[in-house]
């Protein structure tokens, strides 16, 4: 069977590139009156929570792309439902700069708990969309390349995504008590995804 995911992969990669570009565009310090060499350094240092948020979001989008790329590499062709589920993933990914910018703007204010909860919840929604994509593929197993080898991979990925959804939901709740712990959980999750999406020796040989 001929593999027919090229156009979908190219379109998806373009959306991921747009999302990462939008994240980077938001980083910076606005011009202000009375700027000097000394107070500019102070402004740069004071904005560290914003830099952390953008770094965290970049790593998250990068690892989502890695997992997404592996998913499309393991199917022959996308069905109509798979294309729609893939579009849901892309919609949420390209909107990810919105919660990221919101956290960067309000992390040092009295609204920090709400904004971090929103950020964690939105990241969890992206994970839900990835889970739905994987479940959609498992409903149509004939599109999976080498099912004997790749079905266990999908099952492992689904288990990881369920864990991720639980952690993000917990982070969204705990944010109202400790925004720092909630952000630390989102940071820990991209470390988790870095391990979960790592190629096995067999996959690297393909």
Where in this protein do the model-derived segments appear?
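Multi-pass alpha-helical transmembrane bundle typical of ion/small-solute transporters
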Residues: 1-206
């Amino acid at each position: 069977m001929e593999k027919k995911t090229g156009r979908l992969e190219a379109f998806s990669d373009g959306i991921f590139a747009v999302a990462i570009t939008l994240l980077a565009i938001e980083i910076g310090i606005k011009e202000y009156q009375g700027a000097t060499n000394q107070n500019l350094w102070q402004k740069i240092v004071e904005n560290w929570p914003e830099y952390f948020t953008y770094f965290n979001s970049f790593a998250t989008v990068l690892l989502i792309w890695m997992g997404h790329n592996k998913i499309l590499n393991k199917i022959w062709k996308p069905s109509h439902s798979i294309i729609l589920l893939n579009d849901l993933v892309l919609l949420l990914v390209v909107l990810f700069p919105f919660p990221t910018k919101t956290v960067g703007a309000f992390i040092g204010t009295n609204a920090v708990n709400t904004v971090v909860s929103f950020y964690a919840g939105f990241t969890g929604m992206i994970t839900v969309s990835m889970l739905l994509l994987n479940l959609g593929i498992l409903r149509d197993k004939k599109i999976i390349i080498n099912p004997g080898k790749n079905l266990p991979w999908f099952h492992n990925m689904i288990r990881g995504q369920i864990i991720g959804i639980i952690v993000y939901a917990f982070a969204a709740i705990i944010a109202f008590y400790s925004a720092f712990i909630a952000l630390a959980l989102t940071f820990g999750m991209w470390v988790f995804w870095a391990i979960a999406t790592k190629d096995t020796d067999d996959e690297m040989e393909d």
